[in-house]
Every structure is written in C-alpha cells, then in structure tokens.
C-alpha cells in the first residue's frame, strides 16, 4: 500500500513517492549542426521561424517602398506595368502568407503552445522541424522567382480569377510561388 496516498515508484526500503521524482534534464546538443539544423526543440524552431519571417518581412518592406516610390514619382524607377504588378503580387504574398502566418503560427505558436498546455515540447517534434525546413525552402523559391526570366507571378496577391488566369498574367507562372 502507498504511504500518504502516494504510489511507490521503487519497492523496497528506498521507496520514493511518485510526486517527488525529479524531472530529468533533456539532452542538449553542443554542435551548431545538431543544435540548429536537426533540432527538434519547439523553442529553437520558434526562433528559426521568427528570424526567417522577419528576414522575408524586410524584403516585403523594401518592396512596399518601391511600390510607394513608383506611385509617388512615376518613372523614377524604370519599371513597366507588368513588373509593377508582379511587385505588388509578391509584396502581398510575402507580407500576408510568409511573414504574418509564419511569425504568428510558426514563431509564437511553437513558443507559446507548449507553455500554455504545460508540456515540454510539441507532440510531433520531427514533423515540426520538417515543417520549418519546408517553409524555408518555399521562402527561397519565392525569392528566387525574382531572378528567373519573366520574373515572379503577377496574379495579384489574392490569386483570384480573372487575374490568376495564366494566359493574361505576366510572369513565369504560378508554380514558382510554392505556397506551402
């Protein structure tokens, strides 16, 4: 029978009540490779999401400056109508999808959800880590679409028809955006 209502963890003379068992420390990797590349810690992944979202947000900020400069002083920046429309499209997708979604869901979500539920980590840490690397790949493909012939898609940031119809849309197509 348990002493004081606790079930004994170890039977015998050295019985320790279950509520007095100290939590064990998790293994903390020491190298950069295991600490940041293959890390499955939700807080490290949250910092990675946040830094990536802020970096892509700076690209969106520069694109908003270019848009406003083109509106305020037409012709100062050598940009035709299709390039301007592509810039507006990429600015909208960067700010809404790649900045806000990643910062709030990936950054704050990974950092705060384990604290709110009282857990040490997320439920599927490997999938959580993999989702960040897929997001980073999508960001790199999105940025590389500026450098392909024809430029990025110019379908409007909502990607609704009739702007999203590829025959009338400037740019290299919708496949280069990789919205994951």
Predicted ranges, named:
Residues 1-180:
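...captures the hydrophobic TM-helix bundle architecture rather than a specific catalytic motif
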């Amino acid at each position: 029978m348990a002493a004081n209502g606790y079930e004994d963890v170890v039977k015998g003379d050295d019985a320790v009540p279950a509520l007095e068992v100290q939590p064990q420390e998790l293994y903390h990797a020491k190298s950069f490779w295991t600490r940041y590349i293959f890390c499955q810690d939700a807080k490290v992944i949250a910092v990675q999401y946040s830094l990536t979202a802020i970096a892509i947000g700076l690209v969106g900020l520069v694109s908003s400056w270019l848009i406003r400069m083109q509106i305020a002083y037409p012709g100062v920046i050598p940009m035709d109508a299709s390039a301007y429309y592509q810039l507006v499209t990429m600015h909208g997708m960067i700010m809404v999808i790649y900045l806000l979604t990643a910062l709030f869901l990936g950054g704050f979500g990974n950092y705060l959800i384990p604290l709110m539920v009282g857990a040490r980590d997320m439920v599927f840490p490997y999938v959580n880590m993999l989702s960040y690397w897929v997001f980073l790949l999508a960001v790199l493909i999105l940025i590389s679409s500026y450098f392909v012939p024809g430029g990025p898609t110019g379908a409007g940031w909502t990607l609704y028809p009739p702007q999203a119809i590829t025959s009338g849309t400037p740019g290299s197509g919708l496949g280069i955006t990789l919205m994951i």
